[in-house]
């Protein structure tokens, strides 16, 4: 069934169920642009280029019992300067947002395909570069976090992002990420960020790679005419590689 038919049936089901329980209609949209002029000699890590794009994301959904939401949206991306021919798509990329969200005073949980901005954690660019965060802006899986209402900026979260399905054409890929922070008195705090990227094989190549990153840190936020945040931490990285895992 096409995405268009799925969305039409979903909206019809929401409209039909409006009389069954108290519901609030949610309508919104986000618009972002990104300009990144990368002028340098090409190397093994990246290439010299200019990234210039715009993204528009309209959303619609329903809320019931003040804690439950079901959201449908479309992520529309256009790379400036990309000329689409007669047989090419109108936009550079079009992808869905479909997720359920539970939201209470302390706890939030998302399941489905949702925006990366739902994350609370402080993940350095060693985890996600700024371009990765923009162009890979959706998570497909689950997110859960707990946020303290008694201590400011105190939370813990975990998410699973499923990025690839096991098949002959693609590898099985998923990423488990987690972060936490605890704020002490007078602005002192400590926390961590964690990522495990599982890059498994396809049906034609059974090699498996696991990339682990752990970043514990501590810091001090204070005000002296301006807001300051002094932070120090460590980054631990571990790469695990298994060849022909299916035969072992």
Where are these regions (language model features)?
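Surface-exposed coil loops of outer-membrane beta-barrel proteins
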Residues: 40, 108-181, 196-198
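Residues on the lipid-exposed face of transmembrane beta-strands in outer-membrane beta-barrel proteins
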Residues: 56-62, 98-102, 142-146, 178-182, ...
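Transmembrane beta-strands of outer-membrane beta-barrel pores
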Residues: 31-39, 64, 74-80, 104, ...
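Conserved small/polar residues in nucleotide/adenosyl-binding loops
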Residues: 241-248
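Transmembrane beta-strand segments of Gram-negative outer membrane beta-barrel proteins
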Residues: 22-39, 70, 109, 232
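Surface-exposed strand-loop-strand hairpins of Gram-negative outer-membrane beta-barrel proteins
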Residues: 34-55, 83-86
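Repeated loop/turn-to-beta-strand initiation elements of outer-membrane beta-barrel proteins
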Residues: 25, 66-72, 106-110, 150-158, ...
